[in-house]
Amino acid sequence: MDKLIIEGGSRINGEIRISGSKNSGLPILAATLLASGPMHICNLPHLNDITTMLALLRCMGVGVTIDEKMCVEVDPTSITEFEAPYELVRTMRASILVLGPMLARFGKADVSFPGGCAIGSRPVDIHLRGLEAMGAEIEVDGGYIRAKAPNGLKGARYLMDTVTVGGTENLLMAAVLAEGTTILENAAREPEIVDLAECLIAMGAKIKGVGTDRLEIEGVKTLNGCTYEVMPDRIETGTYLVAAAATGGWVKLRDTRADILEAVLLKLEEAGAEITVGEGTIELAMHGKRPKAVSFKTAPYPAFPTDMQAQFTAMNAIAEGTSSVVETIFENRLIQVHELNRMGANIRLEGNTAIITGVEKLKAAPVMASDLRASASLVIAGMLAEGDTLVDRIYHIDRGYECIEEKLQALGVRIRRVPG
């Protein structure tokens, strides 16, 4: 199992390009199953989760061709299998997203219960109840969701009892080919859902309320193939900005967007960062200053994203002052605190709240990543520590960050990968 070794004392300084969004690319790849012809999806990041989703499409008989720039042609007209097997689904939660498209287009789907990061309970019951409201017949058998809609899906009004990104995406994709009008209430509003909706609209879907918590979808008979470019990764953007702020450095990020990261940028400015936004660029400068502690509570978009909590917690560990971080989305997502404390951080857990008193320096230690974003926070902590930090189980980080060591090396960080 590969590990990362980070030499402490690095200060971020340089310019890099931001990759396409994994959390947008995965549902868009699932949406290709809805098309009546080939789709061309561009700006996909080269990540394990994307590779797994493409492997899942291939095992269903879908034609997949990839060029050297990670522009993928997907031809769903050759599909022969309607099962997402455990062997592929077990490593990636987003594989559940093929359920809605398969059911809408082909009237049947067998999908194994998904895997992914171990960060708490993320039940799929909202997906299933929504599909049942649209006329699907669903049973759970032997770890598989077995769904069918012999008479096709019908439009329905469905109120999601909690805000769920995956549930919104699955039901949105199911609704675009359903007969009649579907209204999804309490829908998630994340930019990745907007990106998916815009891709579906480019394919011929009729969707109103994009970017709001009420989506109205008028079903159509067929969707066409199209060419679509995935949005930039806002969490990768935020991670490199936090790394620069924590180390007192400077960074310029290209091919990204500031409008999808407002809550994060506001907190970075509160920490003392000077931020300059250009056309497709974000620049952050700390001028060698130690960041100030910032308190926040995670919540669904447009509030502070749970996927940035761990990185800010690492920055707060060496910040000037005391902060509180409240995690309201996933119950186990403060798990990296124990590893940060092993590196000399002063963090106290009270339920879903971390009380962080900043220390001047962390000390290197061997640490273990528990999920995707926790692993990113430990890499940032390694930059801030005295000595060499070894981060184990970095397969988590490879699920969400394209070429992380190469990008950090380009920014002046002394980091290397060693085979396990």
UniProtKB/Swiss-Prot annotation:
Listed InterPro entries: Enolpyruvate_Tfrase_dom (IPR001986), Enolpyruvate_Tfrase_sf (IPR036968), MurA_subfamily (IPR050068), RNA3'P_cycl/enolpyr_Trfase_a/b (IPR013792), UDP_GlcNAc_COvinyl_MurA (IPR005750)
Catalytic residues as annotated in Swiss-Prot or TrEMBL: 117 (proton donor)
GO cellular component labels: cytoplasm
Protein name: UDP-N-acetylglucosamine 1-carboxyvinyltransferase
Function description: Cell wall formation. Adds enolpyruvyl to UDP-N-acetylglucosamine.
CDD domains hit by this protein: UdpNAET
Pathway given in the UniProt record: Cell wall biogenesis; peptidoglycan biosynthesis
GO BP term, example: UDP-N-acetylgalactosamine biosynthetic process
Keywords from the UniProt entry: Cell cycle, Cell division, Cell shape, Cell wall biogenesis/degradation, Cytoplasm, Peptidoglycan synthesis, Pyruvate, Transferase
Binding site for UDP-N-acetyl-alpha-D-glucosamine: 93, 307, 329
Compartment list: Cytoplasm
